[in-house]
Amino acid sequence: FYRQDYDLALDNLKIVVDKGSPAQAEEANYWQAICKWKKGNAQTGIDELNQLLDESNSKDIRSKCFLSLAEIAGELKDYDTALSYLEEGAKLTKERAQKGVIYGRLAEMAFNKENYDLARDAYENVIANSLSKEKIENAHLQILKILRIEKKYRSASRKIKGMLTDDKFNRIAGNLELELVQLYKVQGETSEIETRLESIVSDYPRTLVSAEAYYLLGKVYTSEKWDLNKAKEFFDQVSKESSKSLFSPMAKTRSKAIDTYLNAEKDLEQHFSIANIDTLAVNPSDSDTSTAGISVIVPNRTVPELYYQLADLEAFNFNRMDKGIEFLNKIISENPNSPFHPKSMFTLAFIYENSGDSIKADSARNLLLETYPNSEYASYISSGVQVELKE
């Protein structure tokens, strides 16, 4: 079986069924069903496992059948059925360690399927049965996430504060602090967030916890505080704290976005300086110093292109939709001859649509269709409308 020679395994299992004891025959029947599934006959395997469930009184055999049926259902992407089978299999399993493993699988699958009641119950069983300290700690953290998702903030806060005072949970104290930050965030207690994160990076340096805290600090400074230089410092610190952090690649992406944003702002200022110099040259006043001899490098990108880049970053990197819309409207109102004029209309419609403002989205689309009926953007919108109508 483990060498995947299922035909030979089936031949040997048939001998066990014919000549073995009733208990051995039942075990062999189970493995026959598994072999047939592994050979590609999933339905045959399902039928034989269900038949064995009907006939057997052995809790061990029945547990194995339920667990294998759960695995087959998962393979067939029938996750609700898989959850049901896992639950039944876990209840019948006698061995505590195995019970903990099964409930762990059940909890993870239920959580991913957003069946939070089942997931929480399963994680409680992981805590009760698992022999792994790490799995027990993770189960506690997952229960806290579920409480937050279900908006049971007071229960979550009480659980966190209780665990923080218990030496048994010292290993995950930093994770508990981070979960407390998430509670502050969802409850709008922004004043507490930065203080708590600064405490975390100080108390748990060079860890996955401090890496995540630096990432969250960077997000604070690209949203509420809007200080991109400070945010970049925090994002750049993430990989220094832990190169293994899941937040490291995201932090690098955000840091690059900040560089792009600051460079675009710098080029815009250069354009404005050139325009100001040109104005002074045409309309000098007695108080003006001479502009002769001043050498100014003209940026490669135009003002509309720079506005568009800023709009793109504001809306899609920093989630500041209003600022993104503001830059797009500047292009639309001030730069009608730019190639970024139709592109800005299209992007504006996209942002409004994603924000759920269908009236403004329709208005932006209609303006684009009227102004640039032969553009690729108009063609895309028209084809999209036709597909929607056909559906």
Segments predicted by a language model, with ranges:
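Acidic, polar-rich low-complexity tracts and alpha-helical solenoid repeat scaffolds
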Residues: F1-E391
